[in-house]
Amino acid sequence: MKKNIIAILFLFTSCVSTKTQNTYTTLETEIDYYTSDNTKELDFPFSDATIVNNVIYVAGQVGNLPGNTKVVPGGIKEETKQTMKNIERILVALGSSMDKVFKCTCMLLDISEWAEMSEEYKKFFAEDKRPSRSAFAGSGLALGAKIEIECWAIR
């Protein structure tokens, strides 16, 4: 009887170990890096976006014209509009679009400009397809910008 119980416990333990090993099997994940010619020319130390498992991670963008290190004039609304155009340009180059964005993070130099930024930002998304979003104030944004936005999208 003891031998039967030991045999059953051994069999049960063997099954659990096999299942655990299968659960932790990992596959190598490929990372694609996208850097536009404009970003290469400016010698920025980052990619415009990385793609992992069909998810596009767009690096923080500011309201500069492509190939230029100065943000557009006109304040938070104009900077936000140009920032969103920069994000859209990257997504389109990667075969995606703004309607596939599911998460954004907005960093503002001055949080009191949140409403003005949001007014321009929401123009880039269908009302029923606005991504989840976080926004906070930070100092020292890239290129002296008032706004920097990063996004995640499906390819």
PLM region spans:
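N-terminal presequence-like segments and the immediate start of the first folded domain
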Residues: 15-85, 89-94, 109-155
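Bacterial Sec-dependent N-terminal signal peptides
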Residues: 1-23
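Alpha-helix N-cap/start motif
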Residues: 97-98
